Amino acid sequence: MNTKEKIKVGILGATGSVGQKFIALLANHPWFEISELAASEKSSGKKYKDTVNWIIPNELPKEIGVMKIKNCTPNLNCKLVFSGLDSSVAGEIEKDFAQNGYTVISNSKNHRMDENVPLLIPEVNPEHLELIKHQKFNGGAIVTNPNCSTIGLTIALKPLLDNFGIESVNVVTMQAISGGGIEVMKSDVVKNNVIPFISGEEGKMETEPLKILGEFNSNKISFANFSISAQCNRVFVFDGHTECVQIKLKKKNTTKEIINIWENFKSIPQIKDLPSAPKQVIHYYEDENLPQPKYQCDIDKGMAVSIGRLRTDNLFDFKFVVLSHNTIRGAAGGAILCAELMHINSLL
């Protein structure tokens, strides 16, 4: 595609941490160009650079900085919007956009478990996009990105479920402060600390993977049939969610077999060479000290999942460690990959 053919996109919640990450990742995208920025009424009418508390290491693009912010109402000059809105307001705003003919790709939790809304990880459940045909939004649609901690876990589980079957999973997370948004990042409470509770997080991790890994049958999803128990902690790391996983499988196998399956896992985004897709979805590390957020978080531009420390377990069958970038793979980058998948399927 040349520049003139790029698809215009808008960003809802453009001044927040996820909205900023959308801007950084879309700045030089080969298929999409930012045409609209929308945020709260207090920011409306102001230049973006004059109202945003820019926290992204990348420099704010000049052409974005001078754009005027609009209200989050469905009169934007685009037909695709990425939503980084807070869940306190996202539900009705996203629905309003969809009912007015916009395609909404949302990072918010509000519509994730709706019956006809895809909860999408492009490498895991691309067929779930068929649910869009059963939405009643007058030409619009809603597609959701899973919770940031759900994505790394579910990518690790997908090849295991397909090859061996899963009986049960236990996961303990160590989640970066960037996952809590700007207010958490600015808070003194998280400094040199571990907070053993993240509101609503454990419920998401125990249910979202079951929908994502579920089987699509003509017009609905039959959830995957295994149990997940989760404990979620906020730790003093800026980026990168680390998860310690225990798993019981239905078929016997070896660590060598599992590692081989992980390292060779690929799906439509890799086959079609989508712009945001990692070349290798899962990287396995033999070094028992890895993966670590400091060193593996940005592998493949933050879109790959890193796994290490696979070994047998006394209570389950195996245990291992998963790492993924929470604001790229787990938020804005994952949502952009969803849009790319939709584009090649003529759904935009």
Task: Label each residue range with its predicted role.
Residues 1-197, 220-221, 226-227, 305, ...:
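N-terminal Rossmann-like NAD(P) cofactor-binding subdomain of oxidoreductases
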Residues 177-348:
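Charged docking surfaces used in two-component/phosphorelay signaling
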